[in-house]
Amino acid sequence: MFLTLALLRKGIPGKQWIGKYRRPRPVTWQIKRNVIKRLEQEAENEYWISRPFMTLEQERGHAAQRREWMWQQIKAERQAKFPEHKYIADQLNHLRVTKTWPS
């Protein structure tokens, strides 16, 4: 009975792969290859980021025209959704049938 309780108890407390006293993962050749590939990609990204595509003069206001065009598109879409104006004069115009200026 005591042996059964001892064998069916929970395992080692905590998680074996996380924490301060975790079990270290074995370093395989695939892990090394992936790390090297990632570092090479990062070095290439740093290379291209370090060289600007445009000068500061070219960069200043280069998207202003596109941004203005996009804002006009958004504004037109909003106005298309909005119902058109209704005036009281148009709705009550039928009441003016017999109204004339005194002559």
From Swiss-Prot:
| InterPro entries, alphabetized | Ribosomal_mL63
Residue spans crossing the bilayer = none
Indicate the principal place this protein occupies in or around the cell: mitochondrion
Q: From the UniProt record, which GO molecular function terms apply?
A: structural constituent of ribosome
Q: Name the keywords, alphabetized.
A: Mitochondrion, Ribonucleoprotein, Ribosomal protein
Provide GO CC annotations from the record: mitochondrial ribosome; ribonucleoprotein complex
Which family does this protein fall into?
Belongs to the mitochondrion-specific ribosomal protein mL63 family.
What PANTHER family does the entry give? LARGE RIBOSOMAL SUBUNIT PROTEIN ML63, MITOCHONDRIAL RIBOSOMAL PROTEIN 63
Name this polypeptide is given? Large ribosomal subunit protein mL63
Q: Could you tell me which species this protein originates from?
A: Danio rerio
